[in-house]
Amino acid sequence: MGKITLYEDRGFQGRHYECSSDHPNLQPYLSRCNSARVDSGCWMLYEQPNYSGLQYFLRRGDYADHQQWMGLSDSVRSCRLIPHSGSHRIRLYEREDYRGQMIEFTEDCSCLQDRFRFNEIHSLNVLEGSWVLYELSNYRGRQYLLMPGDYRRYQDWGATNARVGSLRRVIDFS
């Protein structure tokens, strides 16, 4: 079970809304989101309703300003509680449809290019656990939530290009 409280203003001020499960449309409850407090679980915030648009990964902790979660604006229109898994395994492929060179990860990787000579990933398989893929190294840039399953091309995980700089396991430390 997870719990997140979203606040309209910075510093946990203004109108707020508490969630303990997935919420596809926050618009009736909040006009904007400038701060958040994650009491338990790991969450993905989405810029648009129905889990679309830019994504922002939050772990347990206080985020007094939307820039602390790398938010580009105060628009948060949906949120998802990410299921926890004990083990993690992901395979990344150089080309679409699981072709070309492959590398498998079971741990976080802050710089993909240090481990895999490519900085573009065109397909992947999430075999165990949930992962967050980042467009840039050191867990920066656009973020993409990956749940167990097959992703035959980068558009399948919502990306507009194949650039991948880092990846992180979703682990709830609570």
Curated annotation (Swiss-Prot):
GO cellular component entries: cytoplasm; nucleus
Region (Connecting peptide): 84-87
A GO MF label: structural constituent of eye lens
Residues covered by the Beta/gamma crystallin 'Greek key' domain: 2-40, 41-83, 88-128, 129-171
GO process terms (BP): cellular response to reactive oxygen species; lens development in camera-type eye; lens fiber cell differentiation; visual perception
Variant or mutagenesis effect after changing W43R: In CTRCT4; much less stable than the wild-type protein; more prone to aggregate when subjected to environmental stresses such as heat and UV irradiation
Record's keyword terms, sorted: Cataract, Disease variant, Eye lens protein, Repeat, Sensory transduction, Vision
Effect of R59H: In CTRCT4; lowered solubility; crystallizes easily
InterPro entries linked to this entry: Beta/Gamma-Crystallin (IPR050252), Beta/gamma_crystallin (IPR001064), G_crystallin-like (IPR011024)
Comment field on protein domains: Has a two-domain beta-structure, folded into four very similar Greek key motifs.
Similarity comment text for this entry: Belongs to the beta/gamma-crystallin family.
Role played: Crystallins are the dominant structural components of the vertebrate eye lens.
Recorded disease: Cataract 4, multiple types: An opacification of the crystalline lens of the eye that frequently results in visual impairment or blindness. Opacities vary in morphology, are often confined to a portion of the lens, and may be static or progressive. CTRCT4 includes crystalline aculeiform, congenital cerulean and non-nuclear polymorphic cataracts, among others. Crystalline aculeiform cataract is characterized by fiberglass-like or needle-like crystals projecting in different directions, through or close to the axial region of the lens.
Subunit structure: Monomer.
Annotated protein name in UniProt: Gamma-crystallin D
Annotated source species: Homo sapiens
Gene: CRYGD
